[in-house]
């Protein structure tokens, strides 16, 4: 190669290394186009997800049509609706068509209807069938405040304690109004988990206790003792518990079965040759 050309090549390399390279800033139009592309991608991905109702945040069941989630979503809506109408006082049963009409689910398929009729509503513990129609089945079916007071009184007499407020609200139409009307005939107790329990207020048990007896009662330390130790101590003092003084269940004595006598079976050999074989024991014993 020509040495002049080699010299020129080396000089060009040196100049290229010494000159600083500056990158151009991206134009505003290119940045805006990138942002638009990102927005389009986000909108396309969000459009593929199941739609939800923006007004109340509830999930759109129709987007899951044909899936198990859609079926169970319809079932949950039906049960909640039946509970709400029972609490309003509408306790009469409805047909499936009436329920679907009131819950705005008349457009469900035949398979879903068949599943609701033959399996879902029949086996649901909160739904009962009355003459081919469906009604809500609460834990305590109460008609009015008198029925509530009788139930609380029965629980008190049997030593069952109180009843959860949510169970009463579930089964008693217009429960808050009835509870307010009962006034001091019932007592509220709030548990550590913030759930309220209703008790019957037995006014016959309201009496003044002597102050001296109260002091004696409060002076007995029982913090370090569990229920078993307290029960043992009371037994040693000759005080029996209510369980021991109450009626005891008599356990029926089971009759012994007579032992059946079974004959012992001995093994027998060569029964099929009984007429052919001969016994030579006497002959063998006669030999010297």
From Swiss-Prot:
DNA-binding region positions on the chain: 63-143
UniProtKB keywords: DNA-binding, Nucleus, Transcription, Transcription regulation
Swiss-Prot/TrEMBL GO biological process terms: transcription initiation at RNA polymerase II promoter
Coiled-coil spans in chain: none
Disordered: annotated span: 16-56
Record GO cellular component, one term: transcription factor TFIIE complex
Chain segments annotated as transmembrane: none
Pfam families: TFA2_Winged_2, TFIIE_beta
GO molecular function, one term: DNA binding
Bias-annotated ranges (Low complexity): 41-56
InterPro entries per record: TFA2_Winged_2 (IPR040501), TFIIE-bsu (IPR016656), TFIIE_bsu_DNA-bd (IPR003166), WH-like_DNA-bd_sf (IPR036388), WH_DNA-bd_sf (IPR036390)
Primary localisation category: nucleus
Signal peptide start and end residues: none
Compartments in which it is found: Nucleus
Subunit comment: Tetramer of two alpha and two beta chains.
Family: Belongs to the TFIIE beta subunit family.
Protein task: Recruits TFIIH to the initiation complex and stimulates the RNA polymerase II C-terminal domain kinase and DNA-dependent ATPase activities of TFIIH. Both TFIIH and TFIIE are required for promoter clearance by RNA polymerase.
Protein name: General transcription factor IIE subunit 2
Gene behind this protein: gtf2e2
């Amino acid at each position: 190669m020509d040495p002049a050309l080699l010299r020129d090549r080396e000089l060009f390399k040196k100049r290229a290394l010494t000159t600083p390279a500056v990158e151009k800033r991206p134009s505003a139009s290119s940045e805006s186009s990138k942002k638009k592309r990102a927005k389009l991608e986000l909108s396309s991905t969000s459009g593929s997800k199941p739609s939800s109702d923006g007004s109340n945040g509830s999930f759109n069941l129709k987007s899951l049509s044909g899936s198990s989630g859609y079926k169970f979503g319809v079932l949950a809506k039906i049960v909640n609706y039946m509970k709400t109408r029972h609490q309003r006082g509408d306790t009469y049963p409805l047909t499936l068509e009436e329920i679907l009409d009131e819950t705005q689910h008349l457009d469900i398929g035949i398979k879903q209807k068949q599943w609701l009729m033959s399996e879902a509503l029949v086996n649901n513990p909160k739904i009962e069938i009355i003459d081919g129609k469906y009604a809500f089945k609460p834990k305590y079916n109460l008609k009015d405040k008198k029925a509530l007071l009788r139930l609380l009184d029965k629980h008190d007499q049997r030593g069952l304690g109180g009843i959860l407020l949510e169970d009463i609200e579930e089964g008693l139409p217009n429960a808050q109004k009835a509870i307010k009307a009962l006034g001091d005939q019932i007592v509220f107790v709030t548990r550590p988990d913030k759930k309220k329990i209703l008790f019957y207020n037995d006014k016959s048990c309201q009496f003044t206790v002597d102050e001296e007896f109260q002091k004696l009662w409060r002076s007995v330390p029982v913090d370090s003792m569990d229920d078993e130790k307290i029960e043992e101590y009371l037994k040693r003092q000759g005080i029996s518990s209510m369980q021991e003084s109450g009626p005891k269940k008599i356990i029926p004595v089971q009759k012994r079965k007579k032992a059946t006598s079974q004959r012992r079976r001995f093994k027998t050999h060569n029964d099929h040759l009984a007429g052919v074989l001969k016994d030579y024991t006497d002959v063998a014993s006669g030999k010297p």
